[in-house]
Amino acid sequence: MISFRFLLLSGLCALGISSYAETPKETTGHYHRYKARIQKKHPESIKESAPSETPHHNSLLSPVTNIFCSHPWKDGISVSNLLTSVEKATNTQISLDFSILPQWFYPHKALGQTQALEIPSWQFYFSPSTTWTLYDSPTAGQGIVDFSYTLIHYWQTNGVDANQAAGTASSMNDYSNRENNLAQLTFSQTFPGDFLTLAIGQYSLYAIDGTLYDNDQYSGFISYALSQNASATYSLGSTGAYLQFTPNSEIKVQLGFQDSYNIDGTNFSIYNLTKSKYNFYGYASWTPKPSCGDGQYSVLLYSTRKVPEQNSQVTGWSLNAAQHIHEKLYLFGRINGATGTALPINRSYVLGLVSENPLNRHSQDLLGIGFATNKVNAKAISNVNKLRRYESVMEAFATIGFGPYISLTPDFQLYIHPALRPERRTSQVYGLRANLSL
């Protein structure tokens, strides 16, 4: 587990070293979960903003000096002003994302149990993300450190017990139990010309396997089959490296490997790389820009090894397609599958539609409806006498924005033919997600 001492040390290092660079030049359209959060907060780069009238000093402690020189308290004390000052002084982009998600599930008594579970199930979510540009020059290229951490806590009933009561093979949210994972801590070097990037460190394929609204419980759909690749067996965060080829702004190709042991991403361990078991993957993304709007089409192929934490060797794949069919309509789909017996789902078919700011009221407003059918992996589920081969979920949500930082999202999930409750035709989950983004 990453300790607060480690996080504090990382923060002090970020403030203690001066960097003389511009903000990252991201190719647009290629979805990345953590960079998407930062880009949402920073729709325009610092480079494009008006120059500061505050003099900046260049020394070992210049970032600290520049923070005080920018007078973040002059318009009143606020976390937002302080973060903005830190970002400008250290050449970073920071996103702090908080979420509280109560979910009411029916039935709330597991099959064969006499006592009902407590409802709602309360999930607390916190995820800080940072992009720190160390340098950016025509001769040296661009060097960036990316960091993202996820903390999940439950009160009353956790997601595992709630799923068991509802009888679903897939989860009712993205994180079904208490966990802490280091999703990303990488250094990436983009060489002059922007064609080739080498990244080393800890990262997860969950960040790239998906599109704008079917890859992140925090900002889109909540049910696992609609917020993730439901058959994925890759790590939540593991050490390794990848090469990225970017021949133009519309095409991106990655080839990489990771150690096979750190399935849950709970620590940062280079030692695992000496154990000679590695996961490999290849990924390609295309982001055309037709007249109707931006789109993204991607394919991911991966293999994971058999290790004590995951008792099956797996070959998996994922096909994603998303397209703005109108200025405010975003259509997406996904087909994914995996071999082996690592997870209770070995194939999913997903289709959904999201309307962005449908009433021209607030930029965070969303209306979404999605449908997923999951093929159940019977060999991965034990202690169940009767089991359905397929399970489907229909989900609808509405995100309502309040000011620049807060949003509320009522959410409804209808599970049709829940796999672990063959005596029931449906199970239901109601949720209300409250987000705070700084």
From Swiss-Prot:
Pfam families: OprB. This is Porin AaxA. Belongs to the OprB family. It is a multi-pass membrane protein. InterPro entries: Carb-sel_porin_OprB, OprB_sf. It is found in: Cell outer membrane. GO terms for biological process: amino acid transport; carbohydrate transport; monoatomic ion transport. Keywords: Amino-acid transport, Cell outer membrane, Ion transport, Membrane, Porin, Signal, Transmembrane, Transmembrane beta strand, Transport, Virulence. GO terms for molecular function: porin activity. Facilitates L-arginine uptake, as part of the AaxABC system. The arginine uptake by the bacterium in the macrophage may be a virulence factor against the host innate immune response. Its main location: membrane. It comes from Chlamydia pneumoniae. The gene is aaxA. Residues 1-21 form the signal peptide. Functions optimally at a neutral or moderately acidic pH. One of its GO terms (cellular component) is cell outer membrane. It comes from the Bacteria.
